[in-house]
């Protein structure tokens, strides 16, 4: 098995300028992602895909393979799957095609190396099939939500669920966005990170912090200083 970690780190960011190069605990977001992949001990190649020369240079300094992403794959509306496919194609021009893909978003800077290794082990012990999502327990249970229809609001599942306690409902999770693991061929065939069966690894609340706004950045810096991570 050959495992590749791809870190998508485009240059454009409206909420936080040069977001992927801002520092948390003395390291940029992209460098933290690279280091967590290397320290996991299960990743053979670390690739950073970016349209930004400064990010690509930072990736090289940190020991990653830097792949320049075309501008048309780096806009606000570009699909992440297209950027991954491009990175895999460019990587495979100089290396054998890897078997396992790990996607690491740099905007989850408190993700632990042990989480990456645990997620990959979940994938391999299940025959390298399906996918593994990093998840966190849903703050609001989906059975207690509504769908807007022409006839008014309708419960997602049933009226009875709206009054049930959380303990009576099945455990529900949301994607943390911190890590995805999938077979490379399955990804290329389906052009999707979602391949059934979907398995999961529950991450900590601090690992699930996603840096999207200045407030998020302040929060993650505070957590990093408190936990020395």
Residue ranges and their predicted role:
Residues 2-49:
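N-terminal glycine-rich phosphate-binding loop and ensuing alpha1 helix
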């Amino acid at each position: 098995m050959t495992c590749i970690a791809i870190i998508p780190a485009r240059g454009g960011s409206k909420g936080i300028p040069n977001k992927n190069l801002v520092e948390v605990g003395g390291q940029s977001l992209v460098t933290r992602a690279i280091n967590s992949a290397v320290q996991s001990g299960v990743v053979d190649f670390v690739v950073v895909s970016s349209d930004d020369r400064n990010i690509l240079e930072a990736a090289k300094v940190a020991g990653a393979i830097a792949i320049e992403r075309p501008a048309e794959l780096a806009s606000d509306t570009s699909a992440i799957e297209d950027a991954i496919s491009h990175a895999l194609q460019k990587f495979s021009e100089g290396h054998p095609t890897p078997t396992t893909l790990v996607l690491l978003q740099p905007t989850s800077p408190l993700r632990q190396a042990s989480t990456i290794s645990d997620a990959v082990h979940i994938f391999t012990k299940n025959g390298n099939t399906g996918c593994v999502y990093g998840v966190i327990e849903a703050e609001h249970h989906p059975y207690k939500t509504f769908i807007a229809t022409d006839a008014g609001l309708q419960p997602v599942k049933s009226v009875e669920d709206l009054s049930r306690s959380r303990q009576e409902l099945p455990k529900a999770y949301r994607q943390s966005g911190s890590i995805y693991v999938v077979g490379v061929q399955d990804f290329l065939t389906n052009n999707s990170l979602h391949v059934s069966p979907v398995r999961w690894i529950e991450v900590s609340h601090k690992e699930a912090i996603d840096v999207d706004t200045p407030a998020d950045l302040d929060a993650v810096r505070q957590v990093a200083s408190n936990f020395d991570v």
